[in-house]
Amino acid sequence: MAGSSLACCLLGLLALTSACYIQNCPLGGKRAVLDLDVRTCLPCGPGGKGRCFGPSICCGDELGCFVGTAEALRCREENYLPSPCQSGQKPCGSGGRCAAAGICCSPDGCHADPACDPEAAFSQH
């Protein structure tokens, strides 16, 4: 009797708690992400002129980057969308993409990167 009560309690707790890593898994599991088409991330910032680069990062060529501000609040919605997204065109840094002139962003943060500076590409060394 104690064993079945314990099993019922565990099943009840499991039903009441939902870990985000289970909710965010794509259909077919984690590895199925590789088979999906990558879409452009949500627009954000003033006038929707930026793109989300992480859950609290909004960047645009005309805007620069907003990190952890009200302009980046919309980027939290990406966590609830089932398909992966990608912003920026050129890869940079360690798993990042060029977000604005001279700025490389990944979902974890942003840093200055000369590879993302369009003027540096045309300068002579």
UniProtKB/Swiss-Prot annotation:
Listed SMART domains: NH
Residue positions where Glycine amide is found in the record: 28
GO-annotated molecular function: neurohypophyseal hormone activity; oxytocin receptor binding; V1A vasopressin receptor binding
Disulfide bonds: 20-25, 41-85, 44-58, 52-75, 59-65, 92-104, 98-116, 105-110
InterPro entries tied to this protein: Neurhyp_horm (IPR000981), Neurhyp_horm_dom_sf (IPR036387), Neurohypophysial_hormone_CS (IPR022423)
Annotated signal peptide: 1-19
Keyword match Disulfide bond: yes
Keywords: Amidation, Cleavage on pair of basic residues, Disulfide bond, Hormone, Signal
Swiss-Prot/TrEMBL GO biological process terms: positive regulation of cold-induced thermogenesis; response to external biotic stimulus; response to food; response to mechanical stimulus
One cellular component term from this protein's GO annotations in UniProt: extracellular space
Domain of life of the source: Eukaryota
Entry function: Neurophysin 1 specifically binds oxytocin. Oxytocin causes contraction of the smooth muscle of the uterus and of the mammary gland. Acts by binding to oxytocin receptor (OXTR).
PANTHER family: NEUROPHYSIN (PTHR11681), OXYTOCIN-NEUROPHYSIN 1 (PTHR11681:SF2)
Family, as annotated: Belongs to the vasopressin/oxytocin family.
Subunit and partners: Interacts with oxytocin receptor (Ki=1.5 nM). Interacts with vasopressin V1aR/AVPR1A (Ki=37 nM), V1bR/AVPR1B (Ki=222 nM), and V2R/AVPR2 receptors (Ki=823 nM).
Protein name: Oxytocin-neurophysin 1
The species this protein was found in: Ovis aries
Gene: OXT
